[in-house]
Amino acid sequence: MKTLKKVVTWSLVALLLQSALFFMVDKYYEKTLMNTKVTEVRVYKDSKPQKNIAINIPLDAEKIEASFDGKYISYYENSELTSINTYDGSKHTINAGNNSKLVYSKWLPATNNMILCEQNLNSRRNITFFTYDAENSNKVTPTDTNNHNIILTLNNSADKISNVVLPSSIGIMYIKVLKSNGKNDIFYNDANGKTTTLLSSKNIGNVGAFENKSNLIYDDITNNTVRITNSTWKINNKQTCLLNTDDSDNLYIGVLENGRVRKILYGSIDATIDKLTSLTFKETENKINISITRNGKVYVNNGVKGYVTENATNKKISYKGKLLKITDKAILSLLSGKLLEVNLN
């Protein structure tokens, strides 16, 4: 009996000590956690796999283009548009609708979406607009305020869509049309889906737009100057050309010397001209060799020697084959039908 009492007594003592110990530990960790800085770690499902996947492009492919981050590559083969996911190698054919023909496609500047234009084969003056989301292989048509498809009626069935620019965050669209008489029309599609003619001239060259502003930017090729709609912003007494814009709505223009770029001026059009930053080249450059990424880095391509130079650091980065695109993170090139990538990070 005495032995049983001792066992019970020591069991109770052990239980009390254990409870006290757990209580103290709990309070300690509670206090510690309350005074500990917690860092959130996000794992993005779209992070590129480390394993290299061979991406092959048909040698007879045309209009080979990359999405803004290089995750997707598109090309035409036998008039058929194909999109390839460079992360996993999957392919998707983008088909036109019934009685329609795909006549234009372009990757948007800040998303893995494309803008598509389809011509109605029964009424060839009518062009219907679509967006293609490469992430889910989904093609949809944007609509106006009455839920009607956005359709542009050309003046002539021989007119061609030559460019479409969209400020991604605003919901408007500019469409450049090359007419059969040699002129260019610029159509403006507003946030309500209404389309009007904005400009009509033989003198319109390259066109562009900002990410968060509604202004259209275009080259006036007669006067060799850059113009911006709904703005008095203009550089006088210099021949200039449009190069690009970046994610921060900075405008990049080239100052020309004998048709080649001597220096780059960039900055916000909300500031005065004298506030622009200037980058001067030692030698003039062909504007087609100048790339400006979404994060505002400037690269100059030397296709003969196979390298690009980052302007800020003067660092030369080699690549193989033909340059396809420079993104914020990589240089994409093609060599004998194979997609190659050089990491910039």
Predicted feature residues:
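Sequence/structural signature of beta-propeller modules
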Residues: 1-60
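Surface-exposed loop/turn elements that mediate protein-protein interactions on large endomembrane-trafficking
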Residues: 27-53, 78-96, 126-154, 178-203, ...
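Beta-strand-rich domains and repeat architectures in extracellular enzymes and scaffolds
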Residues: 49-82
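Extracytoplasmic/periplasmic ligand-binding sensor domains
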Residues: 54-57, 83, 89, 104, ...
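Signature of short aromatic-glycine-proline-rich micro-motifs recurring in repeat-based ectodomains
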Residues: 60-63, 158-164
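Hydrophobic core register within WD40 beta-propeller blades
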Residues: 64, 105, 164, 207-208, ...
